[in-house]
């Protein structure tokens, strides 16, 4: 039996896992033409929704995550565990899988 989640706030990542919502590409051109879903490229950029407490390093000490809630991050093309909450899609990544923080 599948559990139906009401909100992404109910997902609390464990250890070094990071919950990310992928930023959607524009479906409309600057001139106002709507693009079909198949022609819209999937962006490799996301926003951090929640962060686990961190993983343990080789010395057994807790290593803090390298990102914070609200950060824009560059995502790998593959990987992560996909989660659907209502119509929204989220992904869980390990801290070391995220490629970069986007500062703009």
UniProtKB/Swiss-Prot annotation:
GO-annotated biological processes: chaperone cofactor-dependent protein refolding; protein folding; protein import into mitochondrial matrix
The keyword Glycoprotein appears for this protein: no
Recorded superkingdom: Eukaryota
Name of this chain's protein: 10 kDa heat shock protein, mitochondrial
Keyword Zinc-finger on entry: no
Pfam families: Cpn10 (PF00166)
Residue numbers carrying Phosphoserine: 81
SMART domains the record matches: Cpn10
Family (UniProt): Belongs to the GroES chaperonin family.
Function: Eukaryotic CPN10 homolog which is essential for mitochondrial protein biogenesis, together with CPN60. Binds to CPN60 in the presence of Mg-ATP and suppresses the ATPase activity of the latter.
A GO MF term: ATP binding
Summary of subunit composition and partner proteins: Homohexamer.
Alphabetized UniProt keyword annotations: Chaperone, Mitochondrion, Phosphoprotein
Native species: Schizosaccharomyces pombe (strain 972 / ATCC 24843)
Annotated TM spans: none
Subcellular location: Mitochondrion matrix
PANTHER family found in the cross-reference section: 10 KDA HEAT SHOCK PROTEIN (PTHR10772), 10 KDA HEAT SHOCK PROTEIN, MITOCHONDRIAL (PTHR10772:SF0)
Predominant localisation class: mitochondrion
Gene Ontology CC, one term: mitochondrial matrix
